[in-house]
Amino acid sequence: TSKLKKHNPDLQLYDNTSITPEELKERALEVEASALKIKGIHQAEGANASHAHSEIFFQTSNGFSYEWMSSRHSISVSAIAELNGSMERDYDYHSARWLEDLRSTQEVGQLAGSRAIARIGSRQIKSGAMPVIFDKRISNALLSALLGAISGPSVARGVSFLKDKLGLQIFDDKIQIFDDPQIMRGYGSRLYDGE
């Protein structure tokens, strides 16, 4: 155990930047104002700015222990577009471990507004088999569904849609999923886990 602890890379999971409630309020107002500057955006449904600092203590039954600090900064806004009696809403959100990596309030607000405007005039299409391009915002939901489906308990209980796919390829060759817990400043990054 002590050998492992001697070779820990610094994954930069903790930013000790301190943010006051007033600064968070100002960020929320800025991201909202940026969304409202987009032509066709009539209101913002909500804007948020937050930061958190955490201290994690990790202990296993075999005596291994480790502790580390982590941080998170985030901003988000939801914008409502209106044109010719049609209303649409969309949002943007960004979070980062380090404040310096957080996208600007202007960028987040403008993207939320632009996304809402782009939805105006959208319509439902007929059902059918067709190529689909997913917005990167849903990648986490897709991956979460997959992880739930490949979990041992789900497969053993027979409730997984992949229960009969053991040993079979389930994705196209072009789709690659990497599990790398040591990405610098990554949300899922950590030096140790419970296994």
Predicted regions and their residues:
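Active-site bordering "gate/hinge" segments
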Residues: 1-194
